[in-house]
């Protein structure tokens, strides 16, 4: 499973395609 935009990515450690996870924000975002 992957995290979508705005979702927490700290636990999963991965975001859906095209999204990135900022370590200090811990949410997926579009570049």
From Swiss-Prot:
The lineage of its organism: Eukaryota, Metazoa, Ecdysozoa, Arthropoda, Chelicerata. Belongs to the neurotoxin 10 (Hwtx-1) family. Expressed by the venom gland. It comes from Coremiocnemis valida. GO terms for cellular component: extracellular region. Keywords: Disulfide bond, Knottin, Secreted, Toxin. Insecticidal toxin that induces reversible paralysis in crickets but not in cockroaches and mice. Molecular target unknown. Disulfide bonds join 2-16, 9-21, 15-28. It comes from the Eukaryota. The presence of a 'disulfide through disulfide knot' structurally defines this protein as a knottin. It is found in: Secreted. GO terms for molecular function: toxin activity. This is U1-theraphotoxin-Cv1a.
């Amino acid at each position: 499973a992957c995290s979508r935009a705005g979702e927490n990515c700290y636990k999963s450690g991965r975001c859906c395609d095209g999204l990135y996870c900022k370590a200090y924000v811990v949410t997926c975002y579009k570049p």
